[in-house]
Amino acid sequence: MNSYIKNHCYLCITQEKIMTLTYKYSTMDRLLSLHNILKENNVDRLRELIESDKDVINMYDSNRLLPLHIAIEHSDIEIVEMLLDNNAVINGGETIKTHPINIAMILAGGRMMLYNDNKPVKPSKRIRRLLTVNNTEKYTKIVKLLIKHGADLKMVCRSYVLDFYKGGSYCIKTGYAIGYSYFSTIPLCQILWEETKHPSLYYMRRITIKCAIRAVNIELVKHFISNNLLADTDTALEDYFLEAVKTNSPKMVKLFLDSGIDINSTICENSHTALYHAVEQENVTLVMLLLNHGADPDIGDIYSMLKYAIMSSKHGVKLFNILVKNGARIRCCNDILIEAICKRYYSIISYILSLPVNYLPISILCMCIYELRNLPITRKLLKKINDINVSCDACNMYPIHAAVSINTSRLTRLLINKGADVNVRNRYGKTPIHLACMYSKIGNIKVLIKNGANVNERDNYGITPLMICSREGKVSNMEYLLANGADVNQTDYDKNTALTYAIRNKSKECTRVLLEHGADMCFMNRFHTPITIHKTHDNPAVFLAVIYLYFSVINDSSIRNKQGFVRNMRFVNNHKETKSLKDEIENELSIMKDNVFYTGDKKISLYDVLILDKLDDLANTIKRIRRIDLKQIIIFRRFIKKHIKYMEKRNSAIESVLSIINEYTSKDHLSRWWLLSPEIHRVIVSNLSMEDLKTISGYY
């Protein structure tokens, strides 16, 4: 019996030890037990648990939270104090957000407020709102308790010094570019001011004030100002005023204005005033508020302030007019005028030109002409410039160059009437007609030629206006130049003609115009002709030139003796595309030779219609030629139709001349004209050239 009792007692003791060991080494059970105690707010059980297992108060649960976190959330001050007295980790937490002091601050109504000097941020994005509860007084007491036991305030109020930022263009007075603070309520700020009485901790006050200003927390900032809490922060009042202006909030700025701050004092390292920053931020309401409270717009960096006003994306004219109306004097008229021209603010430009400006550089006139293209403003500028035949220093460009570069001839006429030289050169040797051919339409070219511009002028590379038109593919400009004496075969310094540029540009129409006006296809530079200088693949201009080459040979057989013709034919025979075109041309010419008809004893073929020297003789047979079917003629159809049209015009001119002669001689009874038959009359008149016929008949 005694043995049984003894064994039973031993077994109970062993089980108790096993349970104790299991409890001791089962973390989950230990934390679960602690959590239940914390939820029940049972101080006695917590005291017993701490006495038996003190290590449990610094263990993380599955959510990576400490018991102190849970105690803070349940707002039991006695339990929090007990945990702290037993060396609970007060500055623990994997992230800044999970530090006990941060959790207590959030529950006490604190929200993280940000300021960022390095990057302009809208006020709505400077505040990160976090979860808060209604009853925050007890959490405020917990915050006091945590601070008393050594909680690190840097977790809830911190800034970062960015050395690279100090040399930037932003205006700051402190070296802090980024900061945040959870002290966003009056009770919490009272705690902060009590705990940061030493000057070495004033930076936390400064961070909190700046965060409150940037977050547009009107109530809190008003508390700071009314209780004179901005004084002991080791920062000038102007620095906080700068932060207030940066918020773009008139209400925030008005708090400082009502406190009696000097509105015209400099508030940044660059000696700018509050008005300057308000203009820079394009805030019309804030600008008006500052001006109504006595801000002087005529002190500090007036040029930059007016420049920012003009460059405003929305309120440029309005801001400029407000500043000028309130006394801002324009000292750098030329620079301000350039800014206004860039933004095309005509009212500002007119105002500046109405001022007594002593000197205007010619570059402003060029800029105004090119950017604005405004005739009235250009007239006003011309009144202030004595000599318009002066070039800009940078590019040696003259006002006439700017005028012809735009698609309006009004400004060109205005400058010419004021005495502009139409043949003046820029730094590249280009005259106004060069630029007109490059950028403008035919209107400016007409004005320049009418006023004596040289159509064959070369630039520094030997390029003529006709070559520019060929290169740019401007057919109408090219036709007008050719009609006014442009040399179709003039070369540049590399021995390239206008035809070379047209073929390089693959411009079929430009090539056709040049060839119709006598462009030489056999002219050679050092190695090439206009045809051989470019590859034939996918270039319709080369194919057209080959067709005209054959047409030229038909009308002038001496071309075959030129070296350029030999080079062209070698090129044609060496390429598949041009060789195929050559076969088609020769086949079509054969068909035209076989297509014949007779007029009396005279045999005429369709091939004869291609020969220019025979057109005058063939004019009498135009009715027969018109009946010929041209379906098989594809390559030379254009030439035949053109020549038929010429013969029709010649016939009409002959009929007109005969009518005039008959009418004139009918009044002279002694005239022997009527002794001749009408057929002989026609033969006599047919011997006249087309030019003579036009002169007599007035036919066009």
Curated annotation (Swiss-Prot):
Keyword NAD on this protein?
no
Q: Which Gene3D superfamilies would you find in this protein's record?
A: Ankyrin repeat-containing domain
SMART domains, A to Z: ANK (SM00248)
InterPro entries per UniProt: Ankyrin_rpt (IPR002110), Ankyrin_rpt-contain_sf (IPR036770), PRANC_domain (IPR018272)
Q: Where are the ANK repeats?
A: 29-59, 63-92, 126-155, 204-233, 236-265, 270-299, 301-332, 395-424, 428-457, 461-490, 494-523
Instruction: Return any one Pfam family short name.
Output: PRANC
What name does UniProt use for this protein? Putative ankyrin repeat protein FPV018
**Which keywords are on file for this protein?**
ANK repeat, Repeat
Taxonomically, the superkingdom here is: Viruses
Q: Does the keyword Repeat apply?
A: yes
